[in-house]
């Protein structure tokens, strides 16, 4: 059997960009982590070590920094589109690319004014710890003949509800020890990704709105299973935003089991099972 080179791509991972705008007395900050991967016919680099078709990964890094200065860092989706279109359309050997951006949010520190009121500080922030906003852009082909697929979302959003969740009537075998319950704590570290139908989108408004809908559904749905809650979260977001084609979730259970205090001879009030 012959040996052949399989599909391949290459790029520069995790290029951290912190862009601070100091045009006015009130500064603004944008904090992103950008990874690039380029696709094309790079077989010569693998088979003979010929680098003539290879745009160095260091050049990709420098391009990210240059674009952060030249076009600015606004919405991550717009930055990814500008960067990806440049690599594919302006670099002859490149036939496609994947741009991934993680975005980190900061909020202003609140300080006391001379009159005793609180105000937001003009140039000091504290890093928010809720979730990381994500953007993934895939481009296949050059110019108008190419296709652009943009997926937005978030990861590491930890949510918990202390009631309003049930789990019972499940399949049981000889190894099952889980006790059915009509009232439990439900928690997860949520990853959500939604694919847009196009690129003429108000990215910030969509992100904020979709996240809010998902949180409301998580809170309000009387959950018989985490899967049911996720479906309702996705359904509600899709109904509200026609710009979105599909939504995918990853949501591992973060279990919170009731501890049997009778083991240490402490009684507790009767609770629903």
What is the predicted role of each segment?
Residues 264-273:
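Single conserved hydrophobic/aromatic residue that forms the stacking wall/gate
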Residues 134-209:
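Charged, well-structured binding/catalytic surfaces in domain cores that contact anionic ligands
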Residues 19, 36-42, 101-105, 141, ...:
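Beta-strand elements of well-folded, non-transmembrane domains
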């Amino acid at each position: 059997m012959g040996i052949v080179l399989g599909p391949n791509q290459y790029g520069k991972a995790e290029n951290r960009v912190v862009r601070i705008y100091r045009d006015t007395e009130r500064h603004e900050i944008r904090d992103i982590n950008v990874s690039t991967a380029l696709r094309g016919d790079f077989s010569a680099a693998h088979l003979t070590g010929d680098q003539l078709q290879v745009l160095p990964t260091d050049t990709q890094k420098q391009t990210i920094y240059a674009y952060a200065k030249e076009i600015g860092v606004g919405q991550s989706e717009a930055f990814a589109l500008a960067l990806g279109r440049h690599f594919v359309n302006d670099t002859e050997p490149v036939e496609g690319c994947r741009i991934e951006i993680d975005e980190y949010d900061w909020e202003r520190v609140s300080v006391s004014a001379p009159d005793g009121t609180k105000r937001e500080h003009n140039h000091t922030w504290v890093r928010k710890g809720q979730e990381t906003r994500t953007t993934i852009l895939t481009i296949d082909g050059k110019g108008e003949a190419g296709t652009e697929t943009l997926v937005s979302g978030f990861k590491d959003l930890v949510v918990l509800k202390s009631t309003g969740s049930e789990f019972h009537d499940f399949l049981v075998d000889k190894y099952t020890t889980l006790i059915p319950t009509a009232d439990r704590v439900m928690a997860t570290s949520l990853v959500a990704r939604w694919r847009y139908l196009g690129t003429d989108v108000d990215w910030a408004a969509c992100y904020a709105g979709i996240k809010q809908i998902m949180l409301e559904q998580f809170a309000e749905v009387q959950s018989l299973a985490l899967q049911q809650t996720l479906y309702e979260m996705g359904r509600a977001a899709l109904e509200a935003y026609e710009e979105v084609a599909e939504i995918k979730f990853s949501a591992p259970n973060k279990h919170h089991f009731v501890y049997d205090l009778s083991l240490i001879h402490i009684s507790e009030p009767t609770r629903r099972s």
